Amino acid sequence: MNEYHYNCVDESVLLPLLEKYIFTPLHKLVPLGIPANFLTLFSIVLMWGGFISFLNTKELSAGHALSAAGAVFGYVVFDHFDGMQAKVTSTSSPLGEILDHYSDVFNGLIVIYLCFRILEIELGALFLVIIWLNCLAFAVTYVEQQIRKQLYFGPIGSLEGVILVIAVMLSCANPSGLQFWQTPILLGQPAYLLIIGGFSASCFFTVFGSFQRLEALPRNFIEFTLTGSLLLGVCLYLRLHWAIPFLVVSFYAGDFILKSMQGVFFDRIQPLPDRFAGLVVLAVLPCEFFELDYEVVLLAYGIYLLLQIVSRGTHILTTFKEYWVWWNPPPDCAPPKT
């Protein structure tokens, strides 16, 4: 295992302002004894609580828009609190970095889900394509980190996107705001496509920007992109309920991203995406032709991917268990920051 050192370049245009006026003042209210990982876990609970709540809600109201915006705002705040807490208490660790950044992968997908629900956009092909683009942006970020040994966040990234989503959600608390986003403004297309178009463009810029810094096209990322796109394409062709491709694509990306993160800390060769994805595609298409239950195949593959993620996660927790603490020591007793 490599000696740990958090190496990150963050050029976010909003981060300095948010740190000055929101994150830093609010962080002063957090007791220094609370471990940074607990703050990360709280942000995860906020997002998954909101996700589960909306899964069980069909009719939405202004209150739902406010609650979704509140959950996402809380996630953003505590997602930055953990890093600030680790820095102030000199408790930065590989466990904390992986827990923080890997949870962002799935929390980001939940943000997209909540945004689509609040805007009352069908959870169909457009939703799944946006989910996949988000996965690509996250994946290339950590593939680049493994190669360059540096994590890079550009001027317009996930933080800016999430702040925009919060603003959109708040506007939908007023019926006229929701009506505005659903009103056709160009070629008969609704205004919310401006948001989706901007998000899609930012994902592409993230990928191409990474290629420019690497001065190469990482083979494993290209294979991940092609295979995952084929997997998503088959799901769209079969017109499945959104939940099945959402889970399969999310876990497929999550497995690859976690392997890439492992490569950063364990100095492994560039990981390849799961090799069973192609076989699943080949198995599903004949099932559709012979009118067999292809959903079972996809669900089984999703469960397999989840078990892979759990296995890798358990290995990481076991390896870095020394960094887990239930309460931070006093500042004068804290270990030196590496």
Predicted regions, residues:
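Small-residue-rich segments of transmembrane alpha-helices in multi-pass membrane proteins
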Residues: 99-112, 156-171, 221-232, 273-285, ...
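Topogenic membrane-insertion module of multi-pass membrane proteins
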Residues: 1-80, 201-217, 223, 278-282, ...
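Hydrophobic alpha-helical transmembrane segments in multi-pass integral membrane proteins
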Residues: 114, 166-180, 232-240, 279-298
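Membrane-embedded alpha-helical segments that form the functional core of polytopic membrane enzymes
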Residues: 40-97, 111-116, 124-140, 190-200
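Hydrophobic core segments of alpha-helical transmembrane domains in multi-pass membrane proteins
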Residues: 67-72, 127-135, 193-202, 243-255, ...
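Eukaryotic endomembrane system proteins
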Residues: 119-203
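Juxtamembrane helix-capping/reentrant segments at transmembrane boundaries
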Residues: 28, 86, 90-103, 152-156
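Alpha-helical transmembrane segments
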Residues: 258-272
